[in-house]
From Swiss-Prot:
The keyword Cell division does not apply. Its EC number is 3.1.21.2. CDD domains: AP2Ec. One of its GO terms (molecular function) is phosphoric diester hydrolase activity. This is Probable endonuclease 4.
Length: 285
């Protein structure tokens, strides 16, 4: 079964997120558990935690269907020790919030070397940052998102994702989230079914599908191989509809959150309905 949804707002309280997801016909959703542009947040209260869990149960969302995203400020590969510690503390807090909420995944951007340390050193710092957080939490998997490779961001090559995983001690609690826009901008072609098969065959060999714990389904305003991160609505960008139809009809993408971060929330319900329809078309073929 495919879990299909979008990154919904938690404005007014975390318990509002499941309701907003249900309103657009989603069977999965992503959210921020705190303000993504601030370092600190008030601790979760028992009431907030209970309300969120009750809402998830009411709208039939299990932890496997929810892909929280951490703060954009965090850089787990930061070259400066003080800033690295600040990011590690914030990441641990994000992991602990997920643990409190009964969530089992935390999606994050791996990190940037800021042109100050070698790529290999940055990747090693990211892996060690994950190890530190995993040692102090239980039940939450750290889900590394591939990037477009903009600026000094790492994680844009499958080999980089594999290198981070290789440095993580508890392989059972690390995974990846593949963002289609980011992959395309990083030079992984997705414009035809044949291109999709080639790209994901490469992913399977280098990273492994056993580590795929979620996806972000986004078309791309940015050009192929441009290393520029610009999302677009499905079928309106440079990737086109074929990739998303192909994903919907491939069983390797079952049972994980498939999350829209496309640019027009007003048509998320339509995009979700279209994605669902591709599965039906395959079943009837």
């Amino acid at each position: 079964m495919k879990y299909i949804g979008a990154h919904v707002s938690a404005a007014g309280g975390l318990a509002n997120a499941p309701a907003r997801a249900a309103e657009i016909g989603a069977t999965a959703f992503a959210l921020f558990t705190k303000n993504q542009r601030q370092w600190r947040a008030a601790p979760l209260t028992p009431q907030v935690i209970d309300d969120f869990k009750i809402a998830c149960e009411k709208y039939h969302f299990s932890a496997a269907q929810i892909l929280p995203h951490d703060s954009y400020l965090i850089n787990l590969g930061h070259p400066v020790s003080e800033a690295l510690e600040k990011s590690r503390d914030a990441f641990l807090d994000e992991m602990q919030r997920c643990e409190q909420l009964g969530l089992t995944l935390l999606n994050f951007h791996p990190g940037s070397h800021l042109m100050q340390i070698a790529q290999e050193d940055c990747l090693a710092r990211i892996a060690e940052s994950i190890n530190i957080a995993l040692a102090q939490t239980e039940g939450v998997t750290a889900v590394i998102e591939n990037t477009a490779g903009q600026g000094s961001n790492l994680g844009f090559e499958f080999e980089q994702l594999a290198a981070i995983i290789d440095g993580v001690e508890d392989k059972s609690r690390v995974g990846v989230c593949i963002d289609t826009c980011h992959a395309f901008a990083a030079g992984y072609d997705l414009r035809t079914p044949e291109a999709c098969e080639k790209t994901f065959s490469e992913f399977g060999k280098i990273v492994g599908f056993q580590y795929l714990r979620g996806m972000h389904l986004n078309d791309a305003k940015s050009a192929f191989g441009s290393r520029v991160d610009r999302h677009h609505s499905l079928g309106e960008g440079n990737i086109g509809h074929d990739a998303f139809r192909w994903i919907m009809q491939d069983g390797r993408f079952d049972g994980i959150p498939l999350i829209l971060e496309t640019i027009n929330p007003d048509i998320w319900a339509e995009e979700i309905a279209w994605l669902k329809a591709q599965q039906i078309a395959e079943a009837m073929a």
